[in-house]
């Protein structure tokens, strides 16, 4: 490869990435998932598109996709809170194992019938498309305001269900090559090995990387690179030992994100940009890899297979996998069934048969790509609508315009939050002394018309003021309400109820004041928080609702899996 060719590749790559970034701004306006835009640009640049670029280097695509997945999952793990694991670890692992087996089996049997394949080849297609995709889930769920139980279950499921799909794919390829039709007992051993090594090396490698980052003094710009290289090393070593590298790198990121770590905010900001670059690069390459003209002959059976998986296989797997977990409402189960987002992982798994030289490998790849397109276009575009219909959305708390960590020490939790006040903010016109600031927070600076003010307690806030507030992450909900817009309060009342009560209030007192219906089944000395928690039957999340004693009780605030505040409204008005 000469210098001219290398420069041409640089130009081509930069043009494609730039176009992807610029066109991504249209995704929200058009209601199209941003990943579809990245994929479409790759297809347009490919052999059947305007670019006409011939690309069929499957090993290179496999390399780029795995590297990108490692970066995306490392970033996703860092952003997963430990509280999410307490709420959703059991259900997510059930869906990542039993759920994938059921989805793959049902989809595989349908594929064998639709494409006139033998049962083993059909099951291979089912295994390829059987798992949800972490990149798609993290990208499309962000900013939707889902309750914690639903969002955590979907995110942890997407980060942990790939080992089962990868193992099923590799096992079925081997069985097809050796003309086997029955599984051996080694199947179970290999599954345990995949999950076991992924968990062990992921947690152990994350802990070792954390200690290294906190112990060694480096220029601030090198900490993100050390975290990135360490995460990729965990991914690579686990994969080389026949474990799940995808699960390992996700858990490695989880350890880094939930323990005190030096230069946390610099690492997170760098990872955010790298994760976007990884998604763009991965979907561009996968878009280049497909030949759209090959999708037309299989369009009808592939569409039927997609609909079967969306409306039959996925819901059956979800309802079966969540049977032991009574904390999920019917609406939550239906919504989780709908969010079976497929993305890069099925396409990457479809490369395995190509590299193994299976006779119908091209068909497997084209079917997987078609299923991914249908999933992103159909399920991805209706995600917001489905969440509202299922009532799994909770009112969003106002967020700061920006936040910067005060990296004085790894154990230091303090941050600076920046809020800009628009006309619809409640606090506009209020004096600083009248603001009910959360304990241990301070207004560090006030800017007005680009000038630094020297405020006093009598200074009144105006539209356009910029406030710099020192606080901690736990203060964000209270600060968000303080600096939130006026309209959402009406939404809060409609969602949580007209009355927000402290969870430590005695149930007997509340029953007397509000004249509740028959409550003989309840210990009158218990608090309303204890009563609601018992009725939920699982770790509570904001937005949990139970109907009891003629009222709807809604968890309005919680801390460390303990209910702090509860909304109350008449049950007959709950669906308005």
From Swiss-Prot:
* Gene Ontology terms for molecular function: flavin adenine dinucleotide binding; potassium:proton antiporter activity
Transmembrane stretches, by residue range?
Answer: 3-23, 30-50, 58-78, 87-107, 109-129, 185-205, 221-241, 280-300, 303-323, 334-354, 363-383
Catalytic reaction list: K(+)(in) + H(+)(out) = K(+)(out) + H(+)(in)
- Which Pfam family, just one, is annotated for this protein? Na_H_Exchanger
Topology relative to the lipid bilayer, per the entry, is: Multi-pass membrane protein
Q: Which Gene3D superfamilies match?
A: 1.20.1530.20, 3.30.465.10, Regulator of K+ conductance, C-terminal domain
Residue stretches making up the RCK C-terminal domain:
403-485
SUPFAM superfamilies noted in UniProt = FAD-binding/transporter-associated domain-like (SSF56176), TrkA C-terminal domain-like (SSF116726)
Q: A cellular component term (GO) from this record?
A: plasma membrane
The listed locations are: Cell inner membrane
Query: Which BP terms from GO are recorded?
Result: cell volume homeostasis
Q: Primary place of residence?
A: membrane
The family database entries (NCBIfam families) matched by this protein are listed as: PRK05326.1-1, PRK05326.1-2, PRK05326.1-3
Q: What is the role of the protein in this entry?
A: K(+)/H(+) antiporter that extrudes potassium in exchange for external protons and maintains the internal concentration of potassium under toxic levels.
Q: Could you tell me what this protein is called? A: K(+)/H(+) antiporter NhaP2
Q: Which organism is it from?
A: Cronobacter sakazakii (strain ATCC BAA-894) (Enterobacter sakazakii)
